[in-house]
Amino acid sequence: MTNALEIRNLKKSFGNLEVIKDLSLTAKKGEVICIIGTSGSGKSTLLRCVNLLETPDSGEVYVNGELIKMKKDKNGKLIPVEQNQVDRIRSKLSMVFQDFNLWSHMTVLQNVIEAPIHVQKIEKNVARKNGYLLLEKVGIAEKADQYPSKLSGGQQQ
């Protein structure tokens, strides 16, 4: 069975600060893993490296058995080989950011459907239908046409 996520010997530093030190882990499909650590220990950086919001200094990341292809640029920094591969893999991953990051000028529903329309290229009417279903699932469908400023902190999350 192919692993959902496999990380091999991942390293990431910011200047002289080594944040991720030769980390390896495997998560099988359906398996739940927890990443626990103190503030500043690299948990968010690890997730950002998996999504390539940050590029690791070295190591390999596999998503559903597929290696994210990286190469060194002229300065020796790792960069993705194929942006199409990055976009495709990102469309299969999810990440909840520490901050709410809702667009204040967009309604709740517009915030929910923005990524599916632009990243996954889902048709707007399909995204709206799915968006309402998701809002129903978390109990805030009645807030679909309101703006984030009208939601509680928990509802925004």
Where are these regions (language model features)?
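Conserved ABC ATPase signature
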Residues: 105, 146-156
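Conserved ABC ATPase "signature" region
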Residues: 66-70, 75-80, 124-143
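Short coil-to-helix segment of the ABC ATPase nucleotide-binding domain corresponding to the Q-loop/switch region
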Residues: 106-114
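The feature captures the beta-strand-to-loop junction immediately N-terminal to the Walker
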Residues: 36-38
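ABC nucleotide-binding domain "signature motif"
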Residues: 57-68
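Helix-to-loop junction immediately C-terminal to a conserved catalytic motif
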Residues: 51
